[in-house]
Amino acid sequence: MPGPTPSGTNVGSSGRSPSKAVAARAAGSTVRQRKNASCGTRSAGRTTSAGTGGMWRFYTEDSPGLKVGPVPVLVMSLLFIASVFMLHIWGKYTRS
């Protein structure tokens, strides 16, 4: 039988049926949580300040692109919804 997989499960590698494998595992073994060595180093290399970039550049003044406030976005979305609604009504009456 091959060594343990990284996830701690042996999917398809055992000759036993899945119900017997689960019963054998649940009967005498304890559940172990895998320790990931890169988990601590991954967050240490990442900076989370607002001015450095990433997702937060979307909300700052130095983000590239068109600056649109929340009120025009709300108005445009409501106009889009109204136009789709009107097209549905127009299509319903022109088809019949």
UniProtKB/Swiss-Prot annotation:
Residue ranges of the region described as Disordered: 1-54
Low complexity bias (residue ranges): 40-50
Similarity comment: Belongs to the SEC61-beta family.
Any Gene Ontology biological process: post-translational protein targeting to membrane, translocation
Membrane topology annotation: Single-pass membrane protein
Stretches of the chain forming a coiled coil according to its record: none
Parts of the chain on the Cytoplasmic side: 2-70
Protein name in the entry: Protein transport protein Sec61 subunit beta
N-acetylproline carried by residues: 2
Phenotype for residue 39 to S: Abolishes S-acylation
Annotated PANTHER family: SEC61 SUBUNIT BETA
Associated disease: Loss-of-function SEC61B variations may cause autosomal dominant polycystic liver disease (PCLD) in patients that lack variations in known causative genes, such as PRKCSH and SEC63.
Chain ranges passing through the membrane: 71-91
UniProt biased composition (Polar residues): 1-17
Alphabetically ordered keywords of this record: Acetylation, Endoplasmic reticulum, Lipoprotein, Membrane, Palmitate, Phosphoprotein, Protein transport, Translocation, Transmembrane, Transmembrane helix, Transport
Subcellular location: Endoplasmic reticulum membrane
One GO CC term on file: endoplasmic reticulum
Example GO molecular function: guanyl-nucleotide exchange factor activity
Subunit composition and interactions: The SEC61 channel-forming translocon complex consists of channel-forming core components SEC61A1, SEC61B and SEC61G and different auxiliary components such as SEC62 and SEC63. The SEC61 channel associates with the multi-pass translocon (MPT) complex. Interacts with TRAM1.
Modification sites for Phosphoserine: 7, 13-14, 17
Lipidation feature positions (S-palmitoyl cysteine): 39
Lumenal side: 92-96
Modified residues (Phosphothreonine): 9
